[in-house]
Swiss-Prot record:
Forms a 10-stranded antiparallel beta-barrel structure able to accommodate a hydrophobic ligand in its interior. In fact, this fold hosts the heme group, which is located in a wide surface cleft. It comes from the Bacteria. Its EC number is 5.99.-.-. The lineage of its organism: Bacteria, Bacillati, Actinomycetota, Actinomycetes, Micrococcales. This is Peroxynitrite isomerase.
Length: 204
């Protein structure tokens, strides 16, 4: 599947452009074993001309034939190349960005390429229940690897200490896996465990 880059996309988002659009598909909770529960998911990556992608994923528990049983969760966030913020960048809050993008050309974006041949990225994701994650990682072509740098929990949130996520574009489909650590209650002394995985097809 050819990747179409929107004409109004800021150069800084070109490495992430293959994510843009809406995706739907299904997956399994846990390690995807025979008794693992099924879910369906709708994911969107959108842009508004600024140097980040807006992310939203809504999931539903399903039966093994894909019929929705009940809502599972929603998560939202922002994806961007990881770089030092400059005076021309917007924020914090409503402080406007300069009308001219900080990175104005492909050559300026290329200068951010790391020693592994990819680009460092940061991803922030918020969940119901007072939990927010800050991930750092790398995008290298159609592959993404993320690890939490910080997990923020509210005073009454469930235990949740770390996570990793991987994404890949394979034959036009978006594949992802999410591993989490939930503290001492997890097996193997609180280490990362398989949480969920899915295969999504692009619908727009």
């Amino acid at each position: 599947m050819p990747i179409e880059i929107p004409t109004d996309l800021t150069p800084e988002l070109v490495p992430l452009s293959w994510l843009i659009g809406e995706w739907e598909g299904s997956g399994r909770l846990g390690a995807g074993e025979e008794d693992s529960e099924h879910f369906s998911q709708h994911v969107s990556f959108t842009h508004n001309g600024l140097p980040y992608l807006q992310y939203r994923a809504e999931s539903w528990l399903t039966d093994d034939e894909g019929t929705r049983l009940r809502p599972l969760t929603v998560e939202t966030g922002f994806w961007a190349l990881e770089r030092k913020q400059r005076e021309e960048d917007g924020g914090p809050g409503l402080i406007p960005a300069d009308i001219v993008p900080v990175l104005k050309s492909a050559d300026e974006v290329e200068a951010l390429r790391n020693s592994d041949g990819g680009f460092d990225i940061s991803v922030s994701i918020s969940h119901p229940g007072g939990i927010s994650e800050l991930y750092y990682g790398q995008i290298k072509g159609p592959q993404i690897q993320l690890s939490t740098d910080m997990v923020m929990r509210g005073s009454h949130s469930k235990e949740y200490t770390a996570a990793t996520r991987i994404f890949g574009l394979v034959d036009g489909k978006l594949l992802w896996r999410w591993d989490v650590a939930t503290g001492a209650g997890s097996t193997q002394g609180g280490g990362l465990e398989a949480h969920a995985s899915a295969i999504l097809s692009k619908i727009s």
